[in-house]
């Protein structure tokens, strides 16, 4: 069991480096304040998570450990947004689409609310 944590941590380190590299590469071509690098990372991560999940489910015979390494470790560190969208997609795919919509609404509204609360609290301190 302990080796699983080491592999997830290693995959997470690789995902973090990939995120930093891609976001920085994209952002260097952008002169505005809009975070295009993060946008590209998040959308790329969502695409990759869906693509790999589908291949793992239907085309490639990979172990649970490999799935965890790639989807939880690498993709989780590359962008947690991809994990959120993947989980929402799994809900919709399993015919729990109401929960998928609720997840979308809650994650976005509560996430933004928490961000704003953090900003307000940070300004008060």
From Swiss-Prot:
It is found in: Cell inner membrane. It catalyses: fluoride(in) = fluoride(out). Pfam families: CRCB. Keywords: Cell inner membrane, Cell membrane, Ion channel, Ion transport, Membrane, Metal-binding, Sodium, Transmembrane, Transmembrane helix, Transport. The keyword DNA damage does not apply. GO terms for molecular function: fluoride channel activity; metal ion binding. Na(+) binds at residues 76, 79. HAMAP family: FluC. GO terms for cellular component: plasma membrane. InterPro entries: FluC. The keyword Cell cycle does not apply. Belongs to the fluoride channel Fluc/FEX (TC 1.A.43) family. The chain crosses the membrane at residues 5-25, 33-53, 69-89, 101-121. GO terms for biological process: cellular detoxification of fluoride. This is Fluoride-specific ion channel FluC. It is a multi-pass membrane protein. Fluoride-specific ion channel. Important for reducing fluoride concentration in the cell, thus reducing its toxicity. Na(+) is not transported, but it plays an essential structural role and its presence is essential for fluoride channel function.
């Amino acid at each position: 069991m302990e080796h699983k944590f080491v592999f997830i941590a290693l995959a997470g380190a690789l995902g973090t480096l990939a995120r930093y590299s891609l976001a920085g590469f994209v952002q260097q071509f952008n002169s505005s304040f809009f975070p295009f690098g993060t946008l590209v990372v998040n959308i790329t991560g969502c695409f990759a998570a869906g693509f790999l999940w589908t291949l793992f489910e239907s085309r490639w015979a990979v172990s649970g450990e490999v799935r965890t390494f790639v989807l939880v470790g690498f993709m989780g560190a590359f962008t947690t947004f991809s994990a959120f969208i993947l989980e929402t997609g799994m809900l919709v795919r399993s015919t729990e689409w109401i929960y998928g919509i609720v997840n979308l609404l809650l994650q976005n509204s509560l996430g933004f609310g928490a961000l704003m609360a953090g900003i307000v609290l940070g300004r008060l301190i």
